[in-house]
Amino acid sequence: DTPYQAHVWMVNTGPHTGDLAWVMGAVTFTDLDSRPESEEHTEDWMKNVMPNVKKVSDGEYWKQDEKVSYSPEGSFTGKEIWTVYDIVPFEGYRFTALLENVVEVYKAKNYPNYFQVYRSQFDGGNGHDVAIGFGFKNYAFFDEDEKFWKDYEEVHGEGSRWKFFEEYREVVKGSYDELSEFMPELSSGE
């Protein structure tokens, strides 16, 4: 696997509905310093890609927080819910504690879906502080009864979800969801 892979996602809900999201990586900043450059690639990009782009928005750099992420083998499905959070300034450590509790449930219950946490590397002034990607296999998942909070209380004790909600209200200013689907035909890797 090369860090210079492009992944294209179609956004189906949320503020960017109908947009294509172009994602490069996983890549480090060090990788960016040595990425391949060629006049041929630049010309191809300008001639064949950019004429099809109506607008470019929200260029952001995100870094996965492995400590509060959960990615079991084979969990990539190509369908994902992204929730982007605006965290109260200087309360990120409290939000991280909430995420640690969530990941503990995923591990204890051996959930098949991934839960990947990313932190914005630069303040864009847009409230995009933390993004969580949650994978699911098919849309029928949304017809199933929600069992997470039942599992949460089995792991953390009766009434623990209400403590979670109280803490959440104090540290999260806002959030939004986007449902996206991976487009392998426009991507260079999974």
Task: Please provide the spans of the model-predicted regions.
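Short S/T/G/P-rich N-terminal loop/turn motif that feeds into the first structured element of a domain
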Residues: 1-190
